[in-house]
Amino acid sequence: MNASFLPPQAGPLLTRHLKMGGANPAGIRLDLTNRYLTRAGQPFLPVMGEFHFSRCEAEAWPAELAKMKAGGVTIAATYLFWIHHEEIEGARRFTGNLDIRRFVLDCGRAGLAVVLRIGPWAHGECRNGGFPDWLVRKGIPLRCNDPAYLALVRGWYAAVFAQVQGLLYKDGGPVIGVQLENELVDDAAHLATLKQIAVEAGFDVPYYTVTGWNAAAGARIPADEVLPVFSAYPDAPWAAGTAPLPLSPHYVFDAERNDAAVGADLMARTAPDGWQLPYDRYPFATCELGCGQQSTYHRRVRISPMDAYALSLVKLGSGNNLIGYYMYHGGTNPVGRLSTMQESRATGYPNDYPILNYDFDTALSEYGEARPQYGLLNLLHLFAADFG
């Protein structure tokens, strides 16, 4: 059988149409078109690797970030899990393994830019998706424009910004972007409000991202305000059963950005009003290419090195212009003062995950071991650096 790939017909190049971009003190501007990111007016193809600072010992950060840099990663992405920092209401902690300022400084010293995924809801297989128990118990509507909820979000965003003040790209620092929320598929107005709150808190950065996937036709996002970023995984440990999955579409070159499987355990499957995310206004960018996969108790998957390499290769060949991995470096869930920190059915979520282990079977393990996909992916990253 012969197969061929017909690339999508590119529309006109759009520039400066998105409400993003910014310069550092040297005047080097980061921007984006509808096709690619730009630096100093020239296209560039960054590689972003997820590494959760609060799931690793602070003393190990410099060495682990150096491994990421050596593997071809140019941007470190990290979640800030609200529950890790404010398990008890009003008692915020940003010290030790929770010291985000120290982590960002370590990233800068390693030559890595930073994207902060500031929530307030994160998921990340964390307890309550990262919400503190005290917030859940308040009984107020969450993840929406409820005034009581937004007041608490303002406090959280302000607290995070206070830790990284002076480290943004405009200050000469490494923080080039923030992600707002995660897997919120049907509330563009709330995402717009979160961006406004983040900007008011001080997060003046070149890039604002949101996850763009949805089981129907892409997440509803505030038009031209944020960059939708996408995902693809080799397996689906969140799937309800243990039977073999259908063949994955992610190993075929095509123009599809949206992954209908990621988050399908928590998201609706239809868009009855015919919504369609306007892909042609945004570059194809990813934040969650699975170069590993976290096992659930009921579905314990193993990812081969070629699973990871082929996935990233196919997405690059399909037009991906921001290579973003989740996770690139595994970690260990902290144990809180009041509870453990893993996602579980006991807290109303659909899956049970290991209490401590967040290794993710990925390029750099929970303890910093380089797995075979680390080297394979680095070959791809070297190619992207030279020809991207």
Please describe what each predicted stretch is.
Residues G90-L98, R109, P120-C144, A158, ...:
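Aromatic- and acidic-residue-enriched segments that line the glycan-binding/catalytic groove
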